[in-house]
Amino acid sequence: MRNSDKQERLIKAFKSILKDEKFSSQGEIVDALKAQGFDNINQSKVSRMLTKFGAVRTRNAKMEMVYCLPIELGVPTTTSPLKELVMEVGHNSALVVIHTGPGAAQVIARLLDSLGKAEGILGVVAGDDTIFITPTNTTTTEELFNSVCDLFDYSI
């Protein structure tokens, strides 16, 4: 079996284990992976995988602290394109608003700021997960909205 195939199997098993929401320690995750035939797994590797996939400790239905993957948060990985961080794009008569995954607004705002007036952007303000974009006098909000949607492959 190729190394990349082994890695894919490991990642799939790791994510499946975390979906069970019953493992409270990294040691328990190591044991579960070893039980599935991943003999070369250790706590250090599990720790790196938890970080890479954005795993967090939270309480499960039994009120136990367990590791899980916060899929609904849209946590980016090291290979995620920026467009995956954009959750929603909307506008009114004055602004275009982008809602992102937690913590992603600053990165996307920086990209938009770099495009600047040539793309019809007068200014950008970003919080943690929300971005306000103001169009220039020569660009309508609707045009800017369409441009932003195209940039991030966002469809309404």
Swiss-Prot record:
Supply one GO BP term: regulation of arginine biosynthetic process
Write down the PANTHER family for this protein, in alphabetical order. Answer: ARGININE REPRESSOR (PTHR34471:SF1)
| Organism this protein belongs to | Photobacterium profundum (strain SS9)
Q: Which InterPro entries match?
A: Arg_repress, Arg_repress_C, Arg_repress_C_sf, Arg_repress_DNA-bd, WH-like_DNA-bd_sf, WH_DNA-bd_sf
What is any one of the record's Gene Ontology cellular component terms?
cytoplasm
From the Swiss-Prot or TrEMBL record, give the protein name: Arginine repressor
Q: Which UniProt keywords apply?
A: Amino-acid biosynthesis, Arginine biosynthesis, Cytoplasm, DNA-binding, Repressor, Transcription, Transcription regulation
Question: Which pathway is this protein engaged in?
Answer: Amino-acid biosynthesis; L-arginine biosynthesis [regulation]
Entry function: Regulates arginine biosynthesis genes.
What Pfam families does this protein's entry cite? Arg_repressor (PF01316), Arg_repressor_C (PF02863)
Gene behind this protein: argR
Where is the protein found, in the record's own terms? Cytoplasm
Q: What is its main location?
A: cytoplasm
Name a GO molecular-function annotation: arginine binding
Family, similarity comment: Belongs to the ArgR family.
